[in-house]
Structure formats: C-alpha cells, structure tokens
Amino acid sequence: MSSGGLLLLLGLLTLWAELTPVSSQDRPKKPGLCPPRPQKPPCVRECKNDWICPGEQKCCRYGCIYECRDPIFVK
C-alpha cells in the first residue's frame, strides 16, 4: 500500500474512532451523581522481593500493596 493510501486509511480510522455511537446520542443521562470515591489505602511498595525484607520476613503482595510480613508455615 502506498504512503498516500496509508494516510487516507489512518485519517478514516481517526474520524471513525471519534464518532459518537448513534444509540447513545438520544439517551438522557441517568439521575443522580456518583458517590465519593471509597477510601482505600494508597498503593505502597515497601519491598520488591523477599531479600529486601529483614530477617525471615517475605515480600507479600496484597492487591497493589507490597509489604514485608512474617511468613506462615503450612504443615
């Protein structure tokens, strides 16, 4: 494909991506407002691997939080 054809295709794709779907144009907004964002602890990365943690502690992941914790042992 020539560079002119690629530019034309890119332009058409850009226009298509910016069009609002017809189905959402005639729908009214739902009533009410969104509630405040729930309070969550900030994402903290105390460690990156077990070797950064002191002593026997391991680097444990809980969602986006990484922290050094004492290990548990399962029998």
Curated annotation (Swiss-Prot):
GO CC annotation terms, alphabetical: extracellular region; extracellular space
Protein's name according to its UniProt entry: Notewaprin-b
Family per record: Belongs to the venom waprin family.
UniProt signal peptide: 1-24
Keyword annotations of the record: Antibiotic, Antimicrobial, Disulfide bond, Secreted, Signal
Function, in words: Damages membranes of susceptible bacteria. Has no hemolytic activity. Not toxic to mice. Does not inhibit the proteinases elastase and cathepsin G.
GO biological process: antibacterial humoral response; innate immune response; venom-mediated disruption of cell wall in another organism
Organism from which the protein derives: Notechis scutatus scutatus (Mainland tiger snake)
Cited PROSITE patterns: WAP
Presence of keyword Signal: yes
PANTHER family assigned: ANTILEUKOPROTEINASE (PTHR19441:SF44), WHEY ACDIC PROTEIN WAP (PTHR19441)
Predominant location category: secreted
Domain of life: Eukaryota
Tissue: Expressed by the venom gland.
Pfam families named among the record's database cross-references: WAP (PF00095)
Disulfides per UniProt: 34-60, 43-64, 47-59, 53-68
Limits of the WAP domain: 27-72
Protein localization: Secreted
Keyword Signal: yes
Molecular function per GO: serine-type endopeptidase inhibitor activity
